[in-house]
Amino acid sequence: MEHQQQQLRNLRDFLLVYNRMTELCFQRCVPSLHHRALDAEEEACLHSCAGKLIHSNHRLMAAYVHLMPALVQRRMADYEAASAVPGVPAEQPRDSPSGS
C-alpha cells in the first residue's frame, strides 16, 4: 500500500512540474491565439524553453541525488542526539539495564 502511495506522490509531483513548465513556456512563447497552429518562431521558442527547463530539472535532480546521503546522515545523527537519554551512551539501547 505504501508503495502505491509513493507512486501516486511521484506521479503528482511529475504532473505539477509538467503543468508548470507548460504554463511558463506557453506564456513566454505564445503571445496571441490568432492562429490555430504555432508559427515557426513560436515552435522554436517552445522547444528552447522546454529544453532549458528540462535541462535545469535534470541538474537539480543530480544535485539532490548527490546531496541526499549527507542530508540523511545528518538527520539521523540529529535524531539520535535528540533521542539520547542523558548519561546513557548512544550505542546502548534505552530499555536495557545499565551496568550489565
From Swiss-Prot:
It is found in: Mitochondrion inner membrane. It is a peripheral membrane protein. Keywords: Disulfide bond, Membrane, Metal-binding, Mitochondrion, Mitochondrion inner membrane, Protein transport, Translocation, Transport, Zinc. GO terms for cellular component: mitochondrial inner membrane; mitochondrial intermembrane space; mitochondrial intermembrane space protein transporter complex; TIM22 mitochondrial import inner membrane insertion complex. A motif (Twin CX3C motif) lies at residues 25-49. SUPFAM superfamilies: Tim10-like. Coiled coil: none annotated. It comes from the Eukaryota. One of its GO terms (biological process) is protein transport. Disulfide bonds join C25-C49, C29-C45. InterPro entries: Mito_inner_translocase_sub, Tim10-like, Tim10-like_dom_sf. GO terms for molecular function: metal ion binding. The keyword Membrane applies. The keyword Zinc applies. Belongs to the small Tim family. The twin CX3C motif contains 4 conserved Cys residues that form 2 disulfide bonds in the mitochondrial intermembrane space. However, during the transit of TIMM10B from cytoplasm into mitochondrion, the Cys residues probably coordinate zinc, thereby preventing folding and allowing its transfer across mitochondrial outer membrane. Component of the TIM22 complex, which core is composed of TIMM22, associated with TIMM10 (TIMM10A and/or TIMM10B), TIMM9, AGK and TIMM29. Component of the TIM22 complex, a complex that mediates the import and insertion of multi-pass transmembrane proteins into the mitochondrial inner membrane. The TIM22 complex forms a twin-pore translocase that uses the membrane potential as the external driving force. In the TIM22 complex, it may act as a docking point for the soluble 70 kDa complex that guides the target proteins in transit through the aqueous mitochondrial intermembrane space. This is Mitochondrial import inner membrane translocase subunit Tim10 B. The lineage of its organism: Eukaryota, Metazoa, Chordata, Craniata, Vertebrata.
